[in-house]
């Protein structure tokens, strides 16, 4: 059999994966049914970008290493006992061990490489040999919920931009961005929710069409003139609108600079973190890029990075012209720097610019999913959040907008940014709702790995830490260990998510609210300790907001003086 006729173990066009719903179990308990349903939900055709290839989002972020591994994971989860733990190594189920009932049912490690070898070249070699997979953040940890998972974080960022740059009023303002994939696809909806109009450049027309169908983008344009006309009309009417422009981001950004047009805000969410699979070089078609990836990877990577350099140079020019310009966490500045753009980091990342004060209080992307499949379960939990946090109109407004404007993808889910003060009591309340029958089936609670204590990423979440500890990756490892000790239902530890190989380490957790008293205890521990690691990490770095939060919430941090001084 020739190389070209060997079946691709990662591609099966015949497979359509839909998670079960309702109360009938396919596994032995809800503690194993939950990871089973969430794994399958990651591959739902309305959730995953390329489900037939096991790709969930973010270039090549997969849910399982290949279809054989997927089938075996499903088989094991169906037979797994409540005192056993499944070990998953880069999407491959490698062992089942006797543990105990409060231990995680699944422990996952994805894409981790010894630092000296932690680069795309070495990873791609292993990936081609079937020895690894790229887990991104929530793809390989089975808690991706579609674009909603990033909408609120993006919304919070745009609200902060409006507050910092435009006196809190985004009316008549517009954002230029690139990328409408799994992460970037959240941008247009988040922008219009925050009052901005948006022009989003995307080279894959199917992505624009999908965002149109799901209500994340309002209109499509095929020329820059057409897109700018839509933006100009929105500026005149004051009504925010989003437009997806079919094109290459590097080309369009450079053209906008050439025309002397200055967006109010400039950013980017193309998959620049992965130059081989995630970014289309200038002048290339999608088909040509796909063929070249098989023929000569080095040429693809070089061409992509050269185009990124062009785009970043345009972003720098727009910043110089007065546009509020920010890196939205895809590592495009690093790629441009490697191509000789020496001032690529002259515009900031979004976390130090807008999000870090939230991280200091353990506030981040808290998300939950209704395993029943019934949207009413989510609406009831929305109401419970409002009852338990009555004095936060900003949060209430978010929940109202989310219900009105966000379509569920796969299993019904919700995200809302809450912190150390609120996560545990919300989780325990959800568990009580399951116990008393208010909800039709259990809820799972998880989060993005982009959270306050679960990631080390010097070009994104930990950029510019005040004590210089940007690259210290002990923190996500400790977060994973503590979540394991606290009784999370599944725990994951990944490398390279968001910004690519060699640039990040991060951890995730998911906890099941099945209505039992044991679950209530686990939920209380996990949903306090998990965000507390974020407060701890930022307090240790010397942030006053975190030190004060630690004192208010009674955290025991032996080396942190809660009188607002940092003890080394």
Curated annotation (Swiss-Prot):
<protein>
    <recommendedName>
        <fullName>Urocanate hydratase</fullName>
        <ecNumber>4.2.1.49</ecNumber>
    </recommendedName>
</protein>
<feature type="binding site">
    <location>
        <position position="202"/>
    </location>
    <ligand>
        <name>NAD(+)</name>
    </ligand>
</feature>
<dbReference type="GO" id="GO:0019556">
    <property type="term" value="P:L-histidine catabolic process to glutamate and formamide"/>
</dbReference>
<dbReference type="InterPro" id="IPR055351">
    <property type="entry name" value="Urocanase"/>
</dbReference>
<dbReference type="GO" id="GO:0019557">
    <property type="term" value="P:L-histidine catabolic process to glutamate and formate"/>
</dbReference>
<feature type="binding site">
    <location>
        <begin position="269"/>
        <end position="273"/>
    </location>
    <ligand>
        <name>NAD(+)</name>
    </ligand>
</feature>
<comment type="similarity">
    <text>Belongs to the urocanase family.</text>
</comment>
<keyword id="KW-0963">Cytoplasm</keyword>
<dbReference type="Pfam" id="PF01175">
    <property type="entry name" value="Urocanase"/>
</dbReference>
<feature type="binding site">
    <location>
        <position position="136"/>
    </location>
    <ligand>
        <name>NAD(+)</name>
    </ligand>
</feature>
<feature type="binding site">
    <location>
        <begin position="279"/>
        <end position="280"/>
    </location>
    <ligand>
        <name>NAD(+)</name>
    </ligand>
</feature>
<dbReference type="Pfam" id="PF17392">
    <property type="entry name" value="Urocanase_C"/>
</dbReference>
<feature type="binding site">
    <location>
        <position position="498"/>
    </location>
    <ligand>
        <name>NAD(+)</name>
    </ligand>
</feature>
<dbReference type="InterPro" id="IPR038364">
    <property type="entry name" value="Urocanase_central_sf"/>
</dbReference>
<comment type="pathway">
    <text>Amino-acid degradation; L-histidine degradation into L-glutamate; N-formimidoyl-L-glutamate from L-histidine: step 2/3.</text>
</comment>
<feature type="binding site">
    <location>
        <begin position="58"/>
        <end position="59"/>
    </location>
    <ligand>
        <name>NAD(+)</name>
    </ligand>
</feature>
<dbReference type="InterPro" id="IPR035401">
    <property type="entry name" value="Urocanase_C"/>
</dbReference>
<dbReference type="InterPro" id="IPR023637">
    <property type="entry name" value="Urocanase-like"/>
</dbReference>
<feature type="binding site">
    <location>
        <begin position="248"/>
        <end position="249"/>
    </location>
    <ligand>
        <name>NAD(+)</name>
    </ligand>
</feature>
<dbReference type="InterPro" id="IPR036190">
    <property type="entry name" value="Urocanase_sf"/>
</dbReference>
<dbReference type="GO" id="GO:0016153">
    <property type="term" value="F:urocanate hydratase activity"/>
</dbReference>
<dbReference type="InterPro" id="IPR035400">
    <property type="entry name" value="Urocanase_N"/>
</dbReference>
<keyword id="KW-0369">Histidine metabolism</keyword>
<feature type="binding site">
    <location>
        <position position="328"/>
    </location>
    <ligand>
        <name>NAD(+)</name>
    </ligand>
</feature>
<dbReference type="InterPro" id="IPR023636">
    <property type="entry name" value="Urocanase_CS"/>
</dbReference>
<feature type="binding site">
    <location>
        <position position="207"/>
    </location>
    <ligand>
        <name>NAD(+)</name>
    </ligand>
</feature>
<keyword id="KW-0456">Lyase</keyword>
<comment type="function">
    <text>Catalyzes the conversion of urocanate to 4-imidazolone-5-propionate.</text>
</comment>
<keyword id="KW-0520">NAD</keyword>
<dbReference type="GO" id="GO:0005737">
    <property type="term" value="C:cytoplasm"/>
</dbReference>
<dbReference type="Pfam" id="PF17391">
    <property type="entry name" value="Urocanase_N"/>
</dbReference>
<feature type="binding site">
    <location>
        <begin position="182"/>
        <end position="184"/>
    </location>
    <ligand>
        <name>NAD(+)</name>
    </ligand>
</feature>
<dbReference type="InterPro" id="IPR035085">
    <property type="entry name" value="Urocanase_Rossmann-like"/>
</dbReference>
<feature type="active site">
    <location>
        <position position="416"/>
    </location>
</feature>
